[in-house]
């Protein structure tokens, strides 16, 4: 079963203090399926000269969107996978996988990294509707993390890059350790986990986790 980003389903005009009174120490947990971020040059190579990323739907993080462009095929030593492209374009190509995805592709030693940290990571082939490219690096397992604004961080008593635990209650209640908090004015409060983590915790549908400091 393929998962997608779960869009935010909350009222954004609720005052932050009221929101934390209602949802004390709670954070929305969103599951992020495998996907790629592309540079402008990669978009042209895969989709053709003059091609652009087309907005299909906006995601929970401001300015980020799922695209309506055809999926790209990732080609690894042992297998292939179709992946969605997220926008906007970036300065470096990035392939975000789960451990299961990496095994299907036959990629070894894919590191757990924060988004944007792609130095010394495996590369692979990408095949689009028009062309294909081979990237030297870019494949990562995304480190589980929480996006939050400075106001959110202040309310929680959390600093940028702080590591916390998050408890998700379900039929398979799980406490995730080593969750990095990423603080920026342009973020919206949400925790992101991958599909392996989602399945392990039974975190299906609209799910909230409890932040443990």
Task: Go through each PLM region and give its residues.
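Extreme N-terminal starter segment of soluble prokaryotic enzymes
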Residues: 24-26
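Short intrinsically disordered, low-complexity coil segments enriched in acidic
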Residues: 1-4, 163
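Short beta-strand-centered segments at strand-helix junctions
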Residues: 28-30, 35-76, 83-129, 134-161, ...
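Short coil-to-beta-strand transition motifs
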Residues: 173-175
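Short, Lys/Arg-enriched N-terminal segments with co-localized hydrophobic residues
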Residues: 3-22
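Short beta-strand-to-coil "C-cap" segments at the C-terminal boundary of structured domains/repeats
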Residues: 211-213
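Acidic, glycine-rich active-site loops and adjacent beta-strand->loop/helix elements
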Residues: 170
